[in-house]
Amino acid sequence: MASFLLLPSSLRHVSFFHPRACPLLKLRFSSTAHMAEQRTYAEAIKLLDSLQSNRAVVSSISSTPSDMNLNAIPEMLEWTRKAGYQPKDLAARGLKYIHVAGTKGKGSVSVMVENILLQYWRSKSRPEALGRIGLYTSPHLIHVRERIRIDGLPISEALFTRYFYELWDRFSLAEEGPDSETKPGYFRYLTLLAFHTFIQEGVGTAIIECGIGGEYDSTNILPQEAVTACAVTSLGIDHKGMLGETVEEIAWHKGGIMKAGVPAFSSEQIPEAQAVLEERASEKGVEFTVVERSSALEDLKLGLEGDFQKDNASLAITVAALHLKTLGVTEVTTSTELPEQFITGLETVRWPARCQYLIDGTTEWLIDGAHTLESIASTAAWFLEKHTSATAMRAPWSRNLLPPYGIASYMRNRSDPGI
């Protein structure tokens, strides 16, 4: 028997912009001894969960986002300062970044780039210019530590706890008065925690996925000189309360990650979205390229299923190749045959709950998540492809399908602010 699981949209909306939308819970420890006793991973998670939630932010600003959008980056820079960093410090020790935005596929592109680069880092030659590989994504599936990865693995509970409290103490020392906000909100805290962790752990390359949008996203404080490439994945309508009602408005926000002098790339877009991205690139003095599906993928079996993943893989190939070239590691001609490291990276990449096929006893699961109508269509196409293939092979499960789960949840949540 096979089941089809479409994750509810609520699992997909876990990023935000603005901490002033509602009061933060102000937490105090009564004594140093008490603080020491409570400094466990479990307590760190409780403190993190007490911070302003993403959904609260979306709900509070959905009707009047303009002013708070304009305040987003200045506020994030102030929190960065309170964390002990200036923007230029994010480039400490030669740390280089790849910045990824988009509506659909930005997590997939990010993890593909990570796995390609890991093949070079794990090789016998181990190029020092590349350095350890960091990845920051959202949301997480099970554990919040999944959002911050180093060398392909989530950071440990011990490391998360250590760096979480280092930032917590810095924010506490920076409190300016009884009415001031004492801590950044959930997504901002995790973003700063990722930067802090990467710097402290000596990461050389970090792939950073935007939370919501791009122009005013908390990740958009990266120093221009530290970014080797910006990528925009497929665009669609999402987070309307924060990004706008049209794909043109949304494209404007996503294109906000482009940085002067840094090459920017995009998957193929609908004409309206592509035109806006081209305008933004022109405004910022950016060399902008639309990446077509690579012919080198025709005979390649990607680790992530779904035909649309070939578009994501094409973007990942282009971005990874430029990053390697910029660092002087290798020059890759991606228009023909791919290097072994690229092939291995794309074939072995894994990203749970993204077009994932699982066998559990006698039940076979087809699992994906979607938060836009276009994403649901892509998920349905993948499911149909699997079902058609199974039917052709007369697979037993093709005749015993459980009804899809999650469609009703998605439709019910379509009225939620910012979705």
Regions found by a protein language model. Name each.
Residues 2-102, 108-131, 136, 176-178:
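Short functional linear segments
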Residues 60-73, 77-78, 86-94, 119-225, ...:
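ATP-dependent carboxylate-amine ligase catalytic core
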Residues 76-79, 113, 117, 191-198, ...:
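Buried hydrophobic packing segments
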Residues 99-101, 134-137, 208-211, 233, ...:
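Short beta-strand segments
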Residues 133, 264, 287-289:
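Hydrophobic beta-strand scaffold residues
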Residues 205-208, 218-231, 235-239, 249, ...:
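Nucleotide phosphate-binding/pyrophosphate-handling subdomain across enzymes
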Residues 212-284, 416-418:
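Conserved catalytic-core segment of NTP-binding enzymes
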Residues 291-295:
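Beta-strand-loop-alpha "switch" segments that mediate conformational coupling across diverse proteins
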